[in-house]
Amino acid sequence: MKPIQKLLAGLILLTWCVEGCSSQHWSYGLRPGGKRDAENLIDSFQEIVKEVGQLAETQRFECTTHQPRSPLRDLKGALESLIEEETGQKKI
């Protein structure tokens, strides 16, 4: 390699290392910045548990569309009633 190419490669590598070392690191609380001590760590975990609990709560939505009764369902009910009348037994 020519000395200019080696110098350029070294400069690019140095720039890449400096950029990587000086970049923002994430704290244990999954939020940027802040100190990493044990007290904040416990608070962060408790905060995460609260957030997950809020996400886990389900919301109930009612169906707004009208679903007509199926004719087959009505026919099945009529046949069951007819069979019960003929046999004299009641469905359990």
Swiss-Prot record:
- Leader peptide range in chain numbering: 1-23
The GO terms describing molecular function are: gonadotropin hormone-releasing hormone activity; gonadotropin-releasing hormone receptor binding; hormone activity
The root-end lineage is: Eukaryota, Metazoa, Chordata, Craniata, Vertebrata
In this chain, the site described as Appears to be essential for biological activity is at: 26
Q: What gene codes for this chain?
A: GNRH1
According to its UniProt entry, this protein's organism is Homo sapiens
Offer one Pfam family short name for this entry.
GnRH
Annotated disorder? Hypogonadotropic hypogonadism 12 with or without anosmia: A disorder characterized by absent or incomplete sexual maturation by the age of 18 years, in conjunction with low levels of circulating gonadotropins and testosterone and no other abnormalities of the hypothalamic-pituitary axis. In some cases, it is associated with non-reproductive phenotypes, such as anosmia, cleft palate, and sensorineural hearing loss. Anosmia or hyposmia is related to the absence or hypoplasia of the olfactory bulbs and tracts.
Q: Which named protein is this?
A: Progonadoliberin-1
Q: Where is it chiefly localized?
A: secreted
Q: Which GO terms describe its cellular component?
A: axon terminus; cytoplasmic side of rough endoplasmic reticulum membrane; dendrite; extracellular region; extracellular space; Golgi-associated vesicle; neurosecretory vesicle; perikaryon
> Which residues are annotated with the PTM Glycine amide?
33
Q: Which residues are recorded as modified (Pyrrolidone carboxylic acid)?
A: 24
